[in-house]
């Protein structure tokens, strides 16, 4: 105890180094004779408008030029966990990273390359920020309350309905198959859960812009709040769990690492009703039988105004602009994840997952796409692991490429070194 950081506070650390690169292929070309158009991404002819790629150019070449280099970013997290009674928790997380310039941050040219560990403060690279600040405490028998100015949706769930992955690679496989429902919204919020036996019921609210007093830009329960309200009913045991959840989102939805550009636009411009069904089973001890996790999500966009940036997805071609209202449309997602513990050597884990990132399933768009990843986590010491991984995206732009019959894909590989202390 003489060497403790504090009599009430424990320090936990996480650092991840990611070294790797991505390649791109396919015959997709940007729409000819159209200058860069920031408000939209595809024309009425279905061809992609590159938003920076030269008109008529091959998009795979543009992607390689802007996101094809070897890169070596990092993510650092320091958790200060304080307990005053032995049953409560005040968590303060300090976080820094420099992923914004990498292909793994969830930005163009391929948002679905986003990684779970890809972080950078809005203030810039290598800047330390307060990423979490919340207080959690029991109330009576079976109830737990959580509130704070920097709390995430999953911090307030009694159970997370997935055992996959033992080590994260692509972000899309870390949302229990339903990123619309489990959006991991982060901001000001509060929640309550109840547990009895194997059953649990959780309810929470998060406003991503809850620090603002301007109702048009933020606040609690306002138009600008970028808010989510979630209810989850779950049942689980020592090695299994299943859950059904509902989330209402208003101005807070997907980012590029969660779905196709069209699906992401639907969330950005509409209020959304989302449901998710997720389950997992893990053997009590390592065996030939894998841990299996599965999940499915369905989202319905609630229609509204057709003003640009509100409910519409903008398209354009030379001398012409149009809007597509996604109000009333729907999108879906699903995944299956498998992993085997103590594979080849004790402490090592191998796993893979596949599925469809969020894609629009109505309005006649051919927005479907597939993602796959495989990895092998080598536990070098109790505190250090090294994970080589590869991954593939079949049609990361969805309808933007498929409606014109053109192809575009991405393949990548990396080595992730993780330190826990």
For each feature predicted by the language model, list its residue ranges:
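A short secondary-structure junction signal
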Residues: 25, 157-160, 204, 213-217
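Short, flexible helix-coil linker/hinge segments at the edges of structured domains or between repeats
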Residues: 160-174
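Beta-barrel outer-membrane channel/assembly domains of diderm bacteria
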Residues: 1-145, 173-177, 181-199, 203-204, ...
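Surface-exposed extracellular loop regions of Gram-negative outer-membrane beta-barrel proteins
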Residues: 100-103, 150-164, 350-358
